Structures are given as structure tokens and as C-alpha cells.
Amino acid sequence: MAGDGGRSGPSTPSTSVITKTKPRTKRPNLYRVLILNDDYTPMEFVVHVLEKFFQMDVEAATKVMLHVHHHGIGECGVFTYEIAETKVTQVMDFARKHQHPLQCVMEKK
């Protein structure tokens, strides 16, 4: 037969290997939200902030507040970047609205 390269008979099926690769997802970086001590913000206000923005109960909020008072800084929680940034902004705006100099920052864990 012309055009078949001189072969006759059925064509042989080709085989191929298909490999499935699972996409690897990278875990997002985590950030610590920290409250800084100052000499002017009342302890009760700090406890209120911890309850309101970090869903702490009174005991946990008081424990964190006392740690901030004695050590100058305390961790409120660990979050992804967007959540940490939002919480810092909320705390700073709330403190400013109530005329307190409370400072809240975030740092990469």
C-alpha cells in the first residue's frame, strides 16, 4: 500500500503514562497581635478591648492585661496577615475614639 511506509496490518496503539500531580498549597504566614503598655490607658479599658476584639473571657483578658502591665507587651492572638491587620486597626481606632493612647502592633511569627 502506498503511503503506509511499507507496513501492512493493523496499527499498534501507543501507550503513555499519565501522572497526576497534586498542587502544593503553602500555609499562610502567621502574625502575632501585640498590645503595648502605657502609663495612661486604664486597665479596665484594656480588658474591655481584649474581650471585644479578641473574644477573650474576663479571666483570660485580665491575665493578658496584667502580663502587659508587668512586662510592657502582651500577645492577644496569632492570625493570618489580613486578620491581624484588621484587628490592629480596630483596636487602634477604638482606643483613639475613647481618647486612650493604647498601642497595638503586629509582628511576623
Curated annotation (Swiss-Prot):
Assembly, per entry: Binds to the N-terminal domain of the chaperone ClpA.
A single BP term in Gene Ontology: protein catabolic process
Xref: SUPFAM superfamilies: ClpS-like
The protein, known as: ATP-dependent Clp protease adapter protein ClpS 2
Superkingdom per UniProt: Bacteria
Species of origin: Rhodopseudomonas palustris (strain ATCC BAA-98 / CGA009)
Function: Involved in the modulation of the specificity of the ClpAP-mediated ATP-dependent protein degradation.
Gene this protein is translated from: clpS2
Family listed: Belongs to the ClpS family.
Annotated segments matching region Disordered: 1-24
